[in-house]
């Protein structure tokens, strides 16, 4: 049985995704969340579905792609409790390089 890495959703990100994600991306969201929960992926630093990687210019914030082509993404952070905290879902228009820092500053209450 696989080891599970705890996911924390204090901000209702999964609920928000259910409301705003187009139907065709909801299954992909489940696959990404399952991959993020798989501790083996974290040990091997291999995330084939979500392409989890650090956000450039943001301290301790990581990005997981729900769908890379469409631009739907999740921002997550590793907490002091060694769990992965879901911070927010980014719509395709929100991940543009020029607006990334502005958006994160506006929503800083969602980040650890």
Briefly describe each language-model feature range.
Residues 3-9, 49-52, 78:
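Generic structural motif
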């Amino acid at each position: 049985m696989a080891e599970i890495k705890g996911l924390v959703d204090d901000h209702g990100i999964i609920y928000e995704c259910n409301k705003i994600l187009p139907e065709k991306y909801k299954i992909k969201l489940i696959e990404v969340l399952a991959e993020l929960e798989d501790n083996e992926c974290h040990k091997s630093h291999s995330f084939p579905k979500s392409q989890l990687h650090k956000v450039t210019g943001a301290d301790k914030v990581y990005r997981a792609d729900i769908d890379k082509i469409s631009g739907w993404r999740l921002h997550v952070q590793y907490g002091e409790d060694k769990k992965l905290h879901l911070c927010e879902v980014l719509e395709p228009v929100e991940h543009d390089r020029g607006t990334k820092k502005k958006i994160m500053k506006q929503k800083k209450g969602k980040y650890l």
